[in-house]
C-alpha cells in the first residue's frame, strides 16, 4: 500500500474494518528514527502516490494529512521522552 509501517517501526497496536462504505486502518508504532525523518517518509509517500499532503503542528503533535479522491490519510507524530518517535497512522479507503 501507499502507507506502510515505517521501516524499523515497532507496531504497538493495529486495527481496521472493511464494513460499510469506508475501509479504515489504524496503526500505532514506535521507531528509533528521528521524527522529522519519519514525517518526511510519509510526506514523500503521499505525494508519490498522488495524494495531497499538508503538514501542521497541533496539541504537541506533528500532523501530515491528505486525500486522493475518496481515500485519505492522517499521520500523527510525536517525540517521546524516551527519545523514540511515536506515530499513529490512519488511512481510509487506501
List each language-model region with its residue ranges.
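An acidic-aromatic pocket/loop used at catalytic or ligand-binding sites
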Residues: 1-94
Amino acid at each position: 500500500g501507499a502507507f506502510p509501517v515505517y521501516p524499523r517501526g515497532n507496531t504497538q497496536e493495529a486495527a481496521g474494518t472493511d464494513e460499510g462504505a469506508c475501509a479504515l486502518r489504524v496503526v500505532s508504532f514506535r521507531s528509533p528514527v528521528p521524527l522529522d525523518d519519519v514525517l518526511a517518509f510519509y510526506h514523500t509517500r503521499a505525494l508519490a502516490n498522488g495524494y495531497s499532503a499538508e503538514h501542521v503542528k497541533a496539541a504537541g503533535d506533528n500532523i501530515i494529512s491528505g486525500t486522493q479522491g475518496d481515500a485519505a490519510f492522517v499521520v500523527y507524530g510525536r517525540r517521546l521522552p524516551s527519545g523514540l518517535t511515536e506515530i499513529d497512522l490512519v488511512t481510509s479507503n487506501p
